[in-house]
């Protein structure tokens, strides 16, 4: 059996359409009619797939800040290394946690949307 180049292209297009239909088939199963409103007009039997993009977490902020109720807390900087020769009094002042300033918490909520 000999198939011409033109027929191969047509068969390829049909296979492509079938593969797209097969991908959408599980999404379309179970509902007989879709209603879509576009520019004030109502279309029946039109299927649309909408994908909502996710907001990204700022990883540097996520490693430094933790959420506590409505605000955020962080550790105090300056205790990790290079502390030889420092007095115990000055090092003790760098212990504990700090609460975020209310003006900065809106910015932190944007950087950490899922925390």
Swiss-Prot record:
In Pfam terms, one family for this protein is Ribosomal_L35p
Q: Name one GO biological process term.
A: mitochondrial translation
Q: Does the keyword Ribonucleoprotein apply?
A: yes
This protein's GO cellular component annotations are: large ribosomal subunit; mitochondrial inner membrane; mitochondrial large ribosomal subunit; mitochondrion
State its location(s).
Answer: Mitochondrion
The transit peptide segment here is 1-53
Q: What does this protein do?
A: Component of the mitochondrial ribosome (mitoribosome), a dedicated translation machinery responsible for the synthesis of mitochondrial genome-encoded proteins, including at least some of the essential transmembrane subunits of the mitochondrial respiratory chain. The mitoribosomes are attached to the mitochondrial inner membrane and translation products are cotranslationally integrated into the membrane.
* Subunit comment: Component of the mitochondrial large ribosomal subunit (mt-LSU). Mature yeast 74S mitochondrial ribosomes consist of a small (37S) and a large (54S) subunit. The 37S small subunit contains a 15S ribosomal RNA (15S mt-rRNA) and 34 different proteins. The 54S large subunit contains a 21S rRNA (21S mt-rRNA) and 46 different proteins.
Q: What is this protein called?
A: Large ribosomal subunit protein bL35m
Tell me what organism the protein belongs to.
Saccharomyces cerevisiae (strain ATCC 204508 / S288c)
């Amino acid at each position: 059996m000999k198939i011409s180049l033109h027929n191969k292209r047509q068969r390829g297009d049909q296979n492509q359409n079938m593969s797209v239909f097969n991908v959408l088939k599980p999404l379309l199963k179970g509902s007989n009619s879709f209603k879509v409103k576009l520019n004030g007009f109502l279309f029946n039997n039109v299927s649309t797939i909408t994908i909502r993009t996710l907001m990204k977490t700022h990883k540097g902020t996520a490693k430094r800040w933790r959420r506590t109720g409505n605000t955020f807390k962080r550790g105090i900087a300056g205790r990790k290394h290079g502390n030889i020769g420092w007095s115990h009094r000055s090092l003790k002042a760098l212990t504990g946690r700090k609460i975020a300033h209310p003006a900065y918490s809106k910015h932190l909520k944007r950087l950490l949307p899922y925390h």
